[in-house]
Amino acid sequence: MSRLQDLFQRKKERVLNMYCTAGYPELNSTVDVMQNLQDAGADMLELGMPYSDPLADGPVIQASASKALANGMTIATLFKQLENFRTSIHVPVVLMGYMNPVLQYGFERFCAAAAAVGIDGLILPDLPLYEWETEYGAILKKYNLDFIFLVTPETSEARIRKLDAASSGFLYAVSSSSTTGGTINLAALENYLQRLQAMDLKNPVLVGFGIKDKKTFDTACNYAQGAIIASAYIKALEQQPDVKQTTQQFLNAVLAP
């Protein structure tokens, strides 16, 4: 059983997936930020690999990626940083990024390196389903890496079922068709999540894009197994770079009873 499957079997609700950008705020902050997120109560982590042209990312995450790239972050550097992270970080960790840098590194080489350090899965929003089916899915399975597809409010029911069947670990429900970090219409979000809930999907559903505080996290968790917080946390780090204090305060507020 994968770490992700184990998590979702143990915790049926209110799963908090926290996003952080590799190499941000400093080049060597990566594992420290991950450690602090785990210690503050994150159930799993989504580690963003910075890329110069991130289609799905809003301005806050784009700015953090630009800073990380300026700091010198590369895929090779990231795998070096992650060599021993499993000695102290036990929650599931998925890498989130884009195909271009992964293909430049070599797709199978990338999967082998990710599996070797203890990564659990990948999110690559610009990997089309047909390419996953014909070429890349088999490589991911070879290295026991979960792969998470994204669905949006505009995705048809038939396509949602296809993406759910192909996904393993969880299904990423994008709250709106805009980029990360925008504001969300809570009534529209509830309607969309109720629709997903009624489909009785194979995978647990986590909601992302616009989840930023206790209110939006609680709303998402009414209809899904959990949610992903990204831009709001990166913004908090940007405003107060004391990683331990900022992380503790941020998660305390989100997870408050």
Model-inferred region functions:
Residues 27-37, 155-166, 207, 211-227:
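Catalytic cores of alpha/beta
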Residues 145-182:
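Histidine/lysine/aspartate-rich catalytic loop segments that bind and position anionic ligands
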Residues 41, 114-121, 140-147, 165-172, ...:
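Glycine-enriched alpha-helix->loop->beta-strand junction motifs that scaffold or abut catalytic
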Residues 1-8, 27, 52-61, 70-83, ...:
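Active-site-adjacent beta->alpha loops and helix N-cap segments on the catalytic face
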Residues 18, 37, 48, 114, ...:
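Conserved, mostly hydrophobic/aromatic
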Residues 11-17, 88-98, 140-150, 198-208:
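Short beta-strand/loop segments at the ligand-binding rim of alpha/beta enzyme cores
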Residues 42-53, 121-123, 127-130, 171-181, ...:
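Glycine-rich phosphate-binding active-site loops on the catalytic face of alpha/beta enzymes
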Residues 21, 26, 96-103, 151-155, ...:
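Glycine-rich beta-to-alpha transition loops that act as phosphate-gripper elements at the mouths
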